[in-house]
Structures are given as structure tokens and as C-alpha cells.
Amino acid sequence: MPSVLLEPNLLGQSNSGVAAQSMEERARTHVPGNVLARFLELRGRQIIKACGTLWYTVPGRFLMSLPYQTMLNLDPDEVRRMIRETRAFGARFPSLSWTGLESGLYVLRHRDYDIGSLHTKHRPRVRRAVQCFEVRTAEKVELLNQGWELNLSTMARQGRYDAEFGDRHRWERFVEAAFACPEIAFPAVFSGPRMAAYMATCREEKWLHILHQMSRQEDLPNFPNHLLTYAVTKQAAVDTSLEAVCYGYVPLFAADGLHEYKLRFGYEMIPHHSAIQLHPSLNLVLNQPATRLAVRIACRLQKHNQHLETLQAVLEGARLSGPSINPC
């Protein structure tokens, strides 16, 4: 099979080799998750340090913890205090010790990774894509123009809209923020000058996080996403400075096809509970059987509505979540 890795490094720069800092200085200044936190902050997200970890705001005025792979066992009183002080609607974090929604993180730790590591249905798709595309890092101007086109194509296909990727000015801010962070990279698939798919990845310490992936509808018959996933995963798998590749959380809405896609590329779904705490005032109103029933009925009437499915999952998570053992 022809090589698909046309560049020595598609994955961005490691933050572990900052020449200007000694190991002692880095130990004092580094906080787990701060690389992704800086990228998010430059994009306009609020970053908070509380409960011994970093948090960032997501649409809906919720807080989520960083880094994604760190399992938390928090004091519920401290979580509620953080939510009140930041005026957030709620917080969500992964835990092995709290109860909550059944969830998980897609992770790959293999060192030996090649075309044979893929599910048999994916192998011919990757081979076909190799004949049609090349893999290289996207340049800023390509992302500003063609990347935005891919965002619109992907969101239209999925029946959703995220202003950060759809609004031209907010997308420009996203790209500028990324290029201010050397750990953020944009591996992409091209047919000549035409971009067919891209990823946004973040390299922090010994983890590579695949943050976003977009593609052009017209190119899907030639499987650009399959080639991109394979190329990035293969390069990360053989990188001895990396411990693991993270392909994101299990989403709060139904996404069976996405789950199967990731597993077929050799990723494992490492289970955990997604713990959700609402603002105490909201909890009194929303964490009620009647409210959950109303949302459940709305989901049945409007099938495949990701916003309603997410709201239903959040309310169910709030009902289920709580510490099962005393916090450390």
C-alpha cells in the first residue's frame, strides 16, 4: 500500500520541549489541560480554575473539565459553589467514582498500527482514498476559505449549526487562535488544491486529542475521512513521545454510526460516568419528573433533534449523578 504520510509531522509541536524553561520551571507553571485551555481562551471561552482542575465554558453556559482523560472525584458542595460563583447553568465532568450517565472516551494506545489494524470494511476504503488524495498539513489561508466551506458542508449534512464554525468572523478567530498555539495542528486531505477533509488536533504532554473533523459532501464517495483518520492515527501510534490518542467523548446524543466508525479504526471506548450537576436554582425546576417527561415527549415528536436529545441527556444525568464514595 502506498505511503499516505507525506509530511514527517502532521501532529503539531509537543509542548514538552520548551527550551526557554527548565524542568523545574515547567513543573511549577504547567497545569494539566492548560494547552487546550489556552486555545479555548483565545477563541473566547471562559477558563476557570476550581475544584483542583481547569474548566471551560460551552454553549448553554455549562462548564466542562480539562483535560478530558482525567477522571475526577469531586466534593459536590465545591462543585455547587463553583457553579454559583461563575453563574454557570451547570457542570459536567468524567468520573469513575461518581454515578452519572454511562459514557466513555475513545482511546488508542497501540504501537503496531497499519492497514491490518482496521476493520475489513475500512481497508478498501482507505486504499481507494489513497489513490484519490494526498495528506498534508493545511495552511492558514486554506483553512480560512476551504475549511469554512467544509464546516458548512458537514453541519448541513448532520442537521446542526455551530456559530463558531459557521459564522465567518468567529471561524477566523478560531483559526487565528489555533495558529497562536504551536500544539494545535490541522492535518488535511487534498485532491490537488481542493481540500476534502481536515482535522483540528491538540498535542499536550503525552496525549494527542482529535478535537474536530470536517469534510466536503461531494468528496465523501472517495472516503477522505477514512484516509485522514488512518493517517493521523498511524503517525500518532508510532510516535514514542505519545502515550495515547483521544478521539473524543461519547456524545450526549445518539451517534451509532460515529461510535462504529471509531471502533473500526482500532479505538477502544474506555467507559466512565459523565457526572452532571445543575445550578441549585435550576435543579429545583428542571430536575423533576414532570420536566423530564415533557422533554422525553418532545424528543419523540421531533426525532433526531440533537438539541432536544442533549437536553434529555443532561436532565437524566442530573438525576443520576452523585458521589458514590467519600471524595479524597
Where are these regions (language model features)?
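Extended catalytic core of nucleotide-activated donor transferases of GT-like folds
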Residues: 71-96
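Active-site/acyl-donor-binding loops of N-acyltransferases
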Residues: 2-55, 96-115, 243-328
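Residue-level marker for well-ordered alpha-helical positions
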Residues: 77, 120-123, 230, 256
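Aromatic (often tryptophan-rich) hydrophobic motifs at membrane interfaces
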Residues: 183-286
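Well-ordered, non-membrane alpha-helical segments in soluble/globular domains
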Residues: 71-80, 168-173, 230
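Hydrophobic beta-strand segments of well-ordered beta-sheets in folded domains
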Residues: 60-65, 84-91, 243-245
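A conserved beta-strand-loop-helix scaffold within acyl/acetyltransferase catalytic domains
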Residues: 2-57, 91-100, 104-221, 234-236
